[in-house]
């Protein structure tokens, strides 16, 4: 998990490449977003606005074809994560949802919140504790070389 303290830092570090530019484009579209409605930019990025507490789960969520970028607008929450290699599969990978559910010990725990940008990489799985409401943009970006079996 990569945590950046602000959007300016994200823009400075990740300024090369179409996928990063599309992340900024998604964030710039914030005034037009309504909670829970998914939007897309091309076929490589989807995004939505979340308002409220992230669902707390006992299992860790992992992806393969997408990685997540969360940009926090308001509030703060606790996220826990661990390398997938240290976790056990509880629910096998589902190609239609790009999710797998894993169990095991928390490797790291961190409070993240307003102004921060968090990138969840594909070799890690994460879960939220649902400890407080947040307002954030959740961006799902295809992994380089990723593909869709059903398209």
How would you describe each model-predicted region?
Residues 1-35, 40-42, 116:
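Surface/interface-facing alpha-helical segments and adjacent flexible terminal/loop regions used
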Residues 34-74, 80-81:
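A short glycine-rich, His/Asp/Glu-containing loop-to-beta-strand
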Residues 49-63, 94-106, 121-124:
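Short acidic (Asp/Glu) patches
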Residues 62-63, 130-133:
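Short glycine/proline-enriched turns and hinge-like loops at secondary-structure junctions
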Residues 64-78, 83-86, 91-102, 140-143:
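Short, conserved beta-strand element in jelly-roll/cupin
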Residues 69, 108-111:
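Short, surface-exposed secondary-structure edge patches
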Residues 69, 132-149:
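A short hydrophobic beta-strand segment most commonly corresponding to one strand
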Residues 110-125, 129-130, 141:
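Conserved metal-binding segment of the jelly-roll/cupin
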